[in-house]
């Protein structure tokens, strides 16, 4: 089973055209491990996306900050939003993210709200 780099569809082969979008299944050549983790933030399998957010935070990947912020703000999965927020805090620290955390401290998501409030306390 192989995931399409462009649309995340499951494909029977690691190369060639995607069964859904017809784009190439494989990603661009030379992607770094960090780039693949950033890609995985959009993965439809929530566990993979959460693991990617946690790993990006643990690795301190600053280039992932915009993607992590999007994952929080899109709020398509509350567990991903929390993992992405924690990852962003681990990378940049609460001082650098203070204004954003202040906004998130009033989020509709109680999970995001709690993490943001703890970070600025």
Question: What positions do the PLM features span?
Answer:
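Amphipathic alpha-helical scaffolding segments comprising HEAT/armadillo-like alpha-solenoid repeats
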Residues: 1, 28-40, 61-74, 93-106
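Alpha-solenoid repeat junctions
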Residues: 25-29, 56, 60, 88-93, ...
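Alpha-helical segment of the N-proximal tetratricopeptide repeat
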Residues: 36-61
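Short cysteine-rich clusters marking metal-coordination/redox-active sites
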Residues: 4-7, 18-21
